[in-house]
Swiss-Prot record:
Lineage of origin: Bacteria, Pseudomonadati, Aquificota, Aquificia, Aquificales
Protein known as: Biotin synthase
Name of a matching Pfam family: BATS
Function: Catalyzes the conversion of dethiobiotin (DTB) to biotin by the insertion of a sulfur atom into dethiobiotin via a radical-based mechanism.
Biological processes annotated in GO: biotin biosynthetic process
Top EC class of this enzyme: transferase
Entries under NCBIfam families matching the protein: bioB
Cofactor(s) recorded in Swiss-Prot or TrEMBL: [4Fe-4S] cluster; [2Fe-2S] cluster
Keyword 4Fe-4S: yes
EC number(s) from the headed UniProt entry: 2.8.1.6
Length: 331
Protein backbone atom coordinates (compact mmCIF):
# COMPACT_ATOMS: atom_id res chain seq x y z
CA UNK A 1 0.00 0.00 0.00
CA UNK A 2 2.84 2.41 0.79
CA UNK A 3 4.04 2.13 -2.80
CA UNK A 4 0.76 3.61 -4.04
CA UNK A 5 1.52 6.84 -2.18
CA UNK A 6 5.03 6.98 -3.65
CA UNK A 7 3.55 6.42 -7.12
CA UNK A 8 1.09 9.29 -6.60
CA UNK A 9 3.95 11.49 -5.43
CA UNK A 10 5.99 10.76 -8.55
CA UNK A 11 2.99 11.43 -10.75
CA UNK A 12 2.29 14.74 -9.00
CA UNK A 13 5.93 15.76 -9.27
CA UNK A 14 6.25 15.04 -12.99
CA UNK A 15 2.71 15.52 -14.28
CA UNK A 16 -0.63 15.71 -12.45
CA UNK A 17 -2.72 13.32 -10.41
CA UNK A 18 -6.28 12.25 -11.19
CA UNK A 19 -9.41 12.95 -9.15
CA UNK A 20 -9.43 9.29 -8.16
CA UNK A 21 -5.91 9.58 -6.78
CA UNK A 22 -6.84 12.77 -4.92
CA UNK A 23 -9.76 10.97 -3.32
CA UNK A 24 -7.45 8.10 -2.43
CA UNK A 25 -5.39 10.52 -0.32
CA UNK A 26 -8.48 11.83 1.47
CA UNK A 27 -9.81 8.35 2.22
CA UNK A 28 -6.47 6.88 3.33
CA UNK A 29 -6.27 5.15 6.69
CA UNK A 30 -4.96 7.33 9.50
CA UNK A 31 -1.88 5.14 9.95
CA UNK A 32 -0.52 6.52 6.66
CA UNK A 33 -0.54 10.13 7.90
CA UNK A 34 3.24 10.27 8.59
CA UNK A 35 3.97 9.00 5.07
CA UNK A 36 1.46 11.40 3.50
CA UNK A 37 2.95 14.37 5.35
CA UNK A 38 6.48 13.33 4.40
CA UNK A 39 5.67 12.99 0.70
CA UNK A 40 3.67 16.22 0.66
CA UNK A 41 6.54 18.10 2.29
CA UNK A 42 8.93 16.52 -0.21
CA UNK A 43 6.69 17.69 -3.07
CA UNK A 44 6.62 21.22 -1.64
CA UNK A 45 10.42 21.19 -1.55
CA UNK A 46 10.48 20.63 -5.33
CA UNK A 47 8.85 24.02 -5.91
CA UNK A 48 9.72 26.17 -2.89
CA UNK A 49 12.58 26.85 -0.51
CA UNK A 50 11.72 24.34 2.19
CA UNK A 51 13.34 26.43 4.93
CA UNK A 52 11.29 29.57 4.29
CA UNK A 53 7.88 30.34 5.77
CA UNK A 54 5.72 33.43 5.50
CA UNK A 55 3.39 35.27 7.88
CA UNK A 56 0.51 37.40 6.63
CA UNK A 57 -1.91 39.63 8.51
CA UNK A 58 -5.31 41.21 7.93
CA UNK A 59 -7.37 44.12 9.17
CA UNK A 60 -11.15 44.04 9.40
CA UNK A 61 -11.37 47.38 7.61
CA UNK A 62 -15.15 47.41 7.32
CA UNK A 63 -17.19 45.18 9.60
CA UNK A 64 -20.66 43.67 9.59
CA UNK A 65 -23.98 44.63 7.98
CA UNK A 66 -23.09 42.61 4.87
CA UNK A 67 -25.91 42.14 2.38
CA UNK A 68 -24.92 38.53 1.64
CA UNK A 69 -26.21 35.45 3.46
CA UNK A 70 -23.07 33.28 3.65
CA UNK A 71 -24.09 30.72 6.27
CA UNK A 72 -20.66 30.55 7.90
CA UNK A 73 -20.17 34.28 8.39
CA UNK A 74 -20.63 36.43 11.49
CA UNK A 75 -20.80 39.60 9.38
CA UNK A 76 -23.98 38.83 7.45
CA UNK A 77 -26.92 41.11 8.24
CA UNK A 78 -29.15 38.01 8.26
CA UNK A 79 -27.73 36.65 11.53
CA UNK A 80 -27.66 38.16 14.99
CA UNK A 81 -24.05 37.76 16.02
CA UNK A 82 -22.09 39.68 18.68
CA UNK A 83 -19.72 41.62 16.44
CA UNK A 84 -18.82 45.26 16.02
CA UNK A 85 -20.42 46.95 13.03
CA UNK A 86 -18.64 49.90 11.45
CA UNK A 87 -17.93 51.54 8.11
CA UNK A 88 -14.53 51.63 6.41
CA UNK A 89 -11.95 52.82 8.92
CA UNK A 90 -9.89 55.91 8.16
CA UNK A 91 -6.58 56.03 6.33
CA UNK A 92 -4.55 56.37 9.52
CA UNK A 93 -5.95 53.15 10.97
CA UNK A 94 -5.30 51.26 7.74
CA UNK A 95 -1.69 52.45 7.77
CA UNK A 96 -1.32 51.55 11.45
CA UNK A 97 -2.52 48.05 10.60
CA UNK A 98 0.34 47.68 8.15
CA UNK A 99 2.82 48.82 10.79
CA UNK A 100 1.42 46.31 13.30
CA UNK A 101 1.78 43.57 10.72
CA UNK A 102 5.45 44.36 10.23
CA UNK A 103 6.01 44.43 14.00
CA UNK A 104 5.01 40.80 14.42
CA UNK A 105 6.73 39.61 11.28
CA UNK A 106 4.08 39.65 8.57
CA UNK A 107 5.19 40.12 4.99
CA UNK A 108 1.71 40.59 3.56
CA UNK A 109 -1.10 42.76 4.85
CA UNK A 110 -4.67 42.44 3.59
CA UNK A 111 -7.36 45.09 4.03
CA UNK A 112 -10.69 43.24 4.19
CA UNK A 113 -14.11 44.82 3.66
CA UNK A 114 -17.47 43.23 4.48
CA UNK A 115 -19.82 43.73 1.53
CA UNK A 116 -20.76 42.17 -1.76
CA UNK A 117 -18.56 44.72 -3.49
CA UNK A 118 -16.63 47.80 -2.40
CA UNK A 119 -18.07 51.10 -3.60
CA UNK A 120 -16.11 53.49 -5.80
CA UNK A 121 -15.64 55.76 -2.79
CA UNK A 122 -14.28 52.89 -0.70
CA UNK A 123 -11.87 51.91 -3.48
CA UNK A 124 -10.56 55.48 -3.57
CA UNK A 125 -10.00 55.44 0.20
CA UNK A 126 -8.19 52.13 -0.04
CA UNK A 127 -5.97 53.56 -2.76
CA UNK A 128 -5.10 56.55 -0.59
CA UNK A 129 -4.16 54.25 2.29
CA UNK A 130 -1.98 52.06 0.07
CA UNK A 131 -0.22 55.10 -1.35
CA UNK A 132 0.51 56.29 2.19
CA UNK A 133 1.89 52.88 3.17
CA UNK A 134 4.20 53.06 0.16
CA UNK A 135 5.14 56.68 0.90
CA UNK A 136 6.19 55.72 4.42
CA UNK A 137 8.28 52.83 3.04
CA UNK A 138 6.53 50.32 5.28
CA UNK A 139 8.09 47.01 4.17
CA UNK A 140 4.99 44.94 3.55
CA UNK A 141 3.08 43.77 0.49
CA UNK A 142 -0.48 45.13 0.45
CA UNK A 143 -3.43 42.97 -0.51
CA UNK A 144 -7.14 43.80 -0.68
CA UNK A 145 -10.26 41.69 -0.18
CA UNK A 146 -13.27 43.76 -1.18
CA UNK A 147 -15.84 41.49 -2.81
CA UNK A 148 -16.73 41.38 -6.48
CA UNK A 149 -14.98 44.56 -7.55
CA UNK A 150 -14.72 45.23 -11.27
CA UNK A 151 -11.76 45.51 -13.59
CA UNK A 152 -11.59 49.33 -13.48
CA UNK A 153 -11.37 49.34 -9.68
CA UNK A 154 -8.81 46.56 -9.75
CA UNK A 155 -6.60 48.60 -12.07
CA UNK A 156 -6.86 51.59 -9.72
CA UNK A 157 -5.80 49.46 -6.78
CA UNK A 158 -2.89 48.07 -8.77
CA UNK A 159 -1.74 51.57 -9.73
CA UNK A 160 -1.89 52.60 -6.06
CA UNK A 161 0.45 49.76 -5.11
CA UNK A 162 -1.74 46.77 -4.29
CA UNK A 163 0.00 43.56 -5.34
CA UNK A 164 -2.59 40.88 -4.63
CA UNK A 165 -6.37 40.52 -4.42
CA UNK A 166 -8.14 37.97 -2.25
CA UNK A 167 -11.51 36.58 -3.29
CA UNK A 168 -12.45 33.11 -2.05
CA UNK A 169 -14.52 30.55 -3.93
CA UNK A 170 -15.07 28.93 -0.48
CA UNK A 171 -16.33 25.55 -1.76
CA UNK A 172 -17.17 23.67 -4.94
CA UNK A 173 -19.58 25.05 -7.52
CA UNK A 174 -21.87 22.11 -6.78
CA UNK A 175 -22.06 22.74 -3.03
CA UNK A 176 -22.01 26.55 -3.07
CA UNK A 177 -25.83 27.01 -3.30
CA UNK A 178 -26.13 25.21 0.05
CA UNK A 179 -24.01 27.94 1.64
CA UNK A 180 -24.91 31.16 -0.20
CA UNK A 181 -28.09 32.21 -2.01
CA UNK A 182 -27.57 35.95 -2.54
CA UNK A 183 -24.93 35.59 -5.25
CA UNK A 184 -23.50 32.83 -7.40
CA UNK A 185 -20.26 30.87 -7.41
CA UNK A 186 -19.70 31.97 -11.00
CA UNK A 187 -19.81 35.61 -9.90
CA UNK A 188 -16.89 34.88 -7.60
CA UNK A 189 -15.09 32.99 -10.35
CA UNK A 190 -15.47 35.95 -12.71
CA UNK A 191 -13.91 38.24 -10.10
CA UNK A 192 -10.83 36.01 -9.90
CA UNK A 193 -10.52 36.09 -13.68
CA UNK A 194 -10.77 39.89 -13.61
CA UNK A 195 -7.97 39.99 -11.03
CA UNK A 196 -5.82 38.01 -13.44
CA UNK A 197 -6.78 40.30 -16.33
CA UNK A 198 -5.66 43.27 -14.24
CA UNK A 199 -2.25 41.66 -13.82
CA UNK A 200 -2.60 41.28 -10.07
CA UNK A 201 -1.58 38.28 -8.02
CA UNK A 202 -4.49 36.03 -7.05
CA UNK A 203 -5.34 34.77 -3.59
CA UNK A 204 -8.42 32.54 -3.41
CA UNK A 205 -9.28 30.14 -0.66
CA UNK A 206 -11.62 27.62 0.83
CA UNK A 207 -13.43 26.82 4.05
CA UNK A 208 -13.52 23.17 5.06
CA UNK A 209 -16.22 21.76 7.32
CA UNK A 210 -19.22 23.47 5.71
CA UNK A 211 -20.87 20.10 5.10
CA UNK A 212 -19.15 19.48 1.79
CA UNK A 213 -18.07 16.03 0.60
CA UNK A 214 -14.59 14.81 -0.26
CA UNK A 215 -15.63 15.09 -3.90
CA UNK A 216 -16.44 18.78 -3.39
CA UNK A 217 -13.00 19.34 -1.89
CA UNK A 218 -11.27 17.64 -4.80
CA UNK A 219 -13.36 19.52 -7.36
CA UNK A 220 -12.37 22.88 -5.89
CA UNK A 221 -8.70 21.91 -5.72
CA UNK A 222 -8.76 21.19 -9.44
CA UNK A 223 -10.57 24.47 -10.18
CA UNK A 224 -7.75 26.35 -8.47
CA UNK A 225 -5.21 24.37 -10.47
CA UNK A 226 -6.95 25.24 -13.73
CA UNK A 227 -7.11 28.91 -12.73
CA UNK A 228 -3.47 28.94 -11.72
CA UNK A 229 -4.09 30.97 -8.56
CA UNK A 230 -0.95 32.09 -6.75
CA UNK A 231 -2.08 31.63 -3.15
CA UNK A 232 -4.73 29.41 -1.54
CA UNK A 233 -5.80 30.21 2.03
CA UNK A 234 -6.95 27.04 3.81
CA UNK A 235 -9.63 27.81 6.40
CA UNK A 236 -11.42 25.44 8.75
CA UNK A 237 -14.92 26.32 9.90
CA UNK A 238 -15.15 27.97 13.29
CA UNK A 239 -18.87 27.55 14.02
CA UNK A 240 -20.36 30.89 15.05
CA UNK A 241 -23.40 31.06 17.36
CA UNK A 242 -26.62 32.19 15.67
CA UNK A 243 -25.40 31.31 12.18
CA UNK A 244 -26.92 28.37 10.26
CA UNK A 245 -23.71 26.36 10.67
CA UNK A 246 -23.35 26.88 14.42
CA UNK A 247 -23.81 23.16 15.11
CA UNK A 248 -21.51 21.80 12.42
CA UNK A 249 -19.12 19.19 13.74
CA UNK A 250 -15.45 20.27 13.62
CA UNK A 251 -13.10 18.38 11.32
CA UNK A 252 -10.66 15.91 12.81
CA UNK A 253 -7.06 17.09 12.73
CA UNK A 254 -6.02 13.99 10.78
CA UNK A 255 -8.66 14.64 8.13
CA UNK A 256 -7.46 18.24 7.89
CA UNK A 257 -3.92 16.99 7.24
CA UNK A 258 -5.18 14.75 4.43
CA UNK A 259 -7.05 17.69 2.89
CA UNK A 260 -3.96 19.90 3.01
CA UNK A 261 -1.92 17.13 1.39
CA UNK A 262 -4.49 16.67 -1.36
CA UNK A 263 -4.48 20.40 -2.15
CA UNK A 264 -0.67 20.35 -2.34
CA UNK A 265 -0.61 17.32 -4.63
CA UNK A 266 -2.94 19.13 -7.05
CA UNK A 267 -1.66 22.70 -6.62
CA UNK A 268 2.01 21.89 -6.27
CA UNK A 269 3.34 25.35 -7.17
CA UNK A 270 0.72 27.44 -5.34
CA UNK A 271 1.31 28.99 -1.92
CA UNK A 272 -0.83 27.20 0.65
CA UNK A 273 -1.73 29.30 3.71
CA UNK A 274 -2.96 28.06 7.07
CA UNK A 275 -5.68 30.50 8.07
CA UNK A 276 -8.93 30.65 10.02
CA UNK A 277 -9.67 27.76 12.36
CA UNK A 278 -6.15 26.35 12.22
CA UNK A 279 -5.75 26.61 15.99
CA UNK A 280 -8.91 24.68 16.88
CA UNK A 281 -8.73 22.13 14.07
CA UNK A 282 -5.04 21.27 13.89
CA UNK A 283 -4.19 21.47 17.57
CA UNK A 284 -1.02 19.48 18.27
CA UNK A 285 -0.68 18.70 14.55
CA UNK A 286 0.08 22.31 13.63
CA UNK A 287 3.70 21.56 12.86
CA UNK A 288 2.85 18.71 10.50
CA UNK A 289 0.56 21.05 8.60
CA UNK A 290 3.27 23.70 8.42
CA UNK A 291 5.66 21.26 6.75
CA UNK A 292 3.17 20.94 3.87
CA UNK A 293 2.34 24.63 3.50
CA UNK A 294 4.08 27.94 2.85
CA UNK A 295 2.50 30.48 5.15
CA UNK A 296 0.09 31.20 7.95
CA UNK A 297 -2.18 34.05 8.91
CA UNK A 298 -0.99 35.51 12.18
CA UNK A 299 -2.43 38.00 14.61
CA UNK A 300 -6.11 37.07 14.44
CA UNK A 301 -8.95 36.95 11.95
CA UNK A 302 -11.93 39.10 11.01
CA UNK A 303 -14.13 38.52 14.06
CA UNK A 304 -12.12 35.95 16.02
CA UNK A 305 -8.83 36.11 17.89
CA UNK A 306 -5.97 34.00 16.60
CA UNK A 307 -3.21 32.02 18.26
CA UNK A 308 -0.60 33.77 20.39
CA UNK A 309 2.04 34.90 17.91
CA UNK A 310 4.76 33.65 20.25
CA UNK A 311 3.48 30.09 19.77
CA UNK A 312 3.85 30.47 16.00
CA UNK A 313 7.38 31.83 16.42
CA UNK A 314 8.24 28.88 18.67
CA UNK A 315 6.73 26.38 16.24
CA UNK A 316 8.86 27.63 13.36
CA UNK A 317 11.94 27.71 15.57
CA UNK A 318 11.37 24.11 16.66
CA UNK A 319 10.89 23.10 13.01
CA UNK A 320 14.07 24.92 11.95
CA UNK A 321 12.07 27.09 9.54
CA UNK A 322 12.92 30.71 8.77
CA UNK A 323 10.38 33.47 8.29
CA UNK A 324 10.62 35.18 4.93
CA UNK A 325 12.06 38.66 5.19
CA UNK A 326 10.16 41.68 3.92
CA UNK A 327 12.77 42.13 1.20
CA UNK A 328 12.15 38.61 -0.08
CA UNK A 329 8.42 39.21 -0.38
CA UNK A 330 8.32 42.89 -1.37
CA UNK A 331 9.93 42.46 -4.76
Amino acid sequence: MEQVFFDIYQKAKNDEISKEEALFILKAEDKYIPLIVYLTSKLKDEFFDSQKFEFCSIINAKSGACSEDCKFCAQSKFYKTPINIYKLVDKEELVEGAIRGVEFGANRYCMVLSSRAASDEEVEKLCEAVQEIKAQNIPINVCVSAGTIGLESLLKLKEAGVTRINHNLETSENYFPNIVSTHTWKERLETIKNVQKAGLSTCSGVIFGLGETDEDRVDLAFVYKELGVDSIPLNFLMPIPNTPLENNKPLRALDALKIIAMFRFINKSAELRLCGGREQTLGDFHGMAAFMTNALMAGGYLTRAGRDIKKDYKMLEDMNLERLTSEEVCK
